[in-house]
């Protein structure tokens, strides 16, 4: 039984999330954005 709403919806694929930050992380799967860099090897991560 789902007890919460899913107000945050992806405008690309329509997947819904309960929190804005979950949607923000999901959007990165579409855009390829990798904003976090490793301080040791400089690789970027989402």
UniProtKB/Swiss-Prot annotation:
Subcellular location: Nucleus
Pfam families in the cross-refs: zf-C2H2 (PF00096)
Domain of life of the source: Eukaryota
Gene3D superfamilies per record: Classic Zinc Finger (3.30.160.60)
UniProt keyword Zinc present: yes
SMART domains, alphabetized: ZnF_C2H2
Gene Ontology CC: nucleus
Keywords tagged on the record: DNA-binding, Metal-binding, Nucleus, Repeat, Zinc, Zinc-finger
C2H2-type zinc finger locations on the chain: 1-4, 8-30, 36-46
Protein name as catalogued: Escargot/snail protein homolog
Native source species: Psychoda cinerea
Organism classification: Eukaryota, Metazoa, Ecdysozoa, Arthropoda, Hexapoda
């Amino acid at each position: 039984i789902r007890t919460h709403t899913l107000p945050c919806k992806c405008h690309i694929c329509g997947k819904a999330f309960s929190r804005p930050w979950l949607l923000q992380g999901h959007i990165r799967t579409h855009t390829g954005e990798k904003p976090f860099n490793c301080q040791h090897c400089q690789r970027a991560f989402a």
